């Protein structure tokens, strides 16, 4: 029997503000592709500026998926992301197009590409409610500390403000006696697709300057008003507003900090997140990195993807 043909998928990863969006559009045009967002926060409607969603002008006719599919008060899991994205990959492939995942959120992308099994077996609604109550009464740091005690690897990977994932990891340990980190390590480490993993990186100081500038531009574009709209709708304690760009401005509306302090914290958190993104991708995935410090490498990256996936670009026809 011949080997089953695996679906071809291009994946563009890298830290925030490095230039993934433009590259993804350029590759989609050249390789007859359609784009799937690999960002866990771009799924939320009305959260456009803070999540740096692709604009109507930038889209330039290229279909985009996994954007604006949930309301901000709704929750969203890695398992649901995995299911939806794999469905999009099938459908895009069936149309004779190339799926291009762009992100973003390391665990989410990894869950799609590798044989991660998410089941409802490890679930305890009563325990989950107890942990949620603890998080509200004693703070997210308290619950995160409990996770550090039983599963330090997951605690290192999951930020304290990501309360849902912290509690999920605790719930898995509570019900199965196994660490979430151990469960993930045990799972099959083989790619499910024929993947071209493209990573963008640049000089750290330049990246940090770009991040600071991006925050200033977001404020000019109306980030304050965008967050105020969510705040005035009464959206509190939701997964969506834990996103960088929202929690900092929420602190301003809660009179915890001045606007200047909120913007400064947003820049700091964005830079830290970029560093965490790079660390994650370098440790968890076999990525071919392209340094774009001195400018775009679109032609070079296009040649690499053509070769890796054995494709012919529209540019070479």
Swiss-Prot record:
Keywords: ATP-binding, Magnesium, Nucleotide-binding, Transferase, tRNA processing. It holds the Pfam family IPPT. SUPFAM superfamilies: P-loop containing nucleoside triphosphate hydrolases. It comes from Bacillus cereus (strain AH820). Monomer. The keyword Nucleotide-binding applies. Catalyzes the transfer of a dimethylallyl group onto the adenine at position 37 in tRNAs that read codons beginning with uridine, leading to the formation of N6-(dimethylallyl)adenosine (i(6)A). This is tRNA dimethylallyltransferase. It is an enzyme of class 2 (transferase). GO terms for biological process: tRNA modification. Residues 39-42 are annotated as: Interaction with substrate tRNA. Its cofactor is Mg(2+). Disulfide bonds: none annotated. The gene is miaA.
């Amino acid at each position: 029997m011949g080997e089953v043909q695996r679906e071809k998928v291009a994946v563009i990863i890298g830290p925030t503000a490095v230039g993934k969006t433009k590259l993804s559009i350029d590759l989609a045009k050249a390789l007859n592709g359609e784009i799937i967002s690999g960002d866990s926060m771009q799924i939320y409607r009305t959260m456009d500026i803070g999540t740096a969603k692709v604009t109507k002008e930038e889209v330039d006719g290229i279909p985009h998926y996994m954007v604006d599919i949930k309301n901000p008060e709704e929750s969203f899991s890695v398992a649901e992301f995995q299911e939806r994205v794999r469905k999009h990959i099938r459908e895009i492939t069936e149309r004779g197009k190339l799926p291009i995942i762009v992100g973003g959120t390391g665990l989410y992308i990894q869950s799609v590409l590798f044989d991660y099994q998410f089941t409802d077996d490890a679930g305890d609604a009563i325990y989950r409610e107890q942990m949620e109550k603890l998080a509200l009464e004693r703070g997210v740091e308290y619950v995160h500390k409990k996770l550090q005690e039983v599963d330090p690897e997951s605690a290192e990977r999951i930020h304290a403000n990501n309360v849902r994932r912290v509690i999920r990891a605790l719930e898995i340990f509570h019900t199965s006696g196994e660490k979430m980190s151990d469960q993930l390590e045990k799972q099959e480490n083989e790619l499910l697709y024929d993947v071209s993993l493209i990573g963008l990186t640049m000089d750290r100081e330049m990246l940090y300057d770009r991040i600071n500038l991006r925050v200033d531009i977001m404020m000019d574009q109306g980030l304050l008003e965008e967050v105020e709209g969510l705040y005035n709708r009464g959206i509190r304690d939701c997964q969506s507003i834990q996103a960088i760009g929202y929690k900092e401005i929420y602190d301003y509306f809660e009179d915890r900090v001045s606007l200047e302090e909120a913007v400064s914290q947003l820049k700091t958190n964005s830079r830290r997140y970029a560093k965490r993104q790079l660390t994650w991708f370098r440790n968890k995935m076999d990525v071919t990195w392209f340094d774009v410090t001195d400018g775009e490498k679109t032609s070079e990256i296009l040649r690499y993807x053509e070769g890796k996936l054995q494709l012919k670009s529209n540019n070479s026809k």
